[in-house]
Amino acid sequence: MDRSFSELRNISSQIGNNIDFVQGAGGNTSLKENNTLWVKASGCWLSDSINKNIFVPVDREEVTRLIESNNLSDLVVKNVDFQKEYFLHPSIETALHALMPHKFVLHIHAVNALSIAVLSNGKKYVERLLQDINWVWIPYVMPGIQLAKAIQNA
């Protein structure tokens, strides 16, 4: 876990310090280790990941159960003492991270991607660029459980 957590902190800092990938407290990253999902805390900056504790441990099984019930408001930090010490709360995108099968998930807000996404012909533009890649276009939905469900159903 220590090496993986160090890798998470390092890549989070790298992308958090690149204005083309992340602006302010936007974007989030996560690491899955056994039944724990370490996800960036709400309101924290990825660029602070080396010098500050910005990750929150949550129970992956609980997140999955809450996704099924459409209610992430019941999500609690896995280690209550951890939350009391650091006053951190999981990102609104915790469900999205839990649904992804990958050990590491990097959810960024790349300026170039966003500028294409808002174009009236953005989807057609992306179709030309990614014709040999398996991908999905998700029309805008609110962040959180709605986005996670849209991705899950795509």
Residue ranges of model-derived segments:
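Glycine-rich flexible loops
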Residues: M1-A154
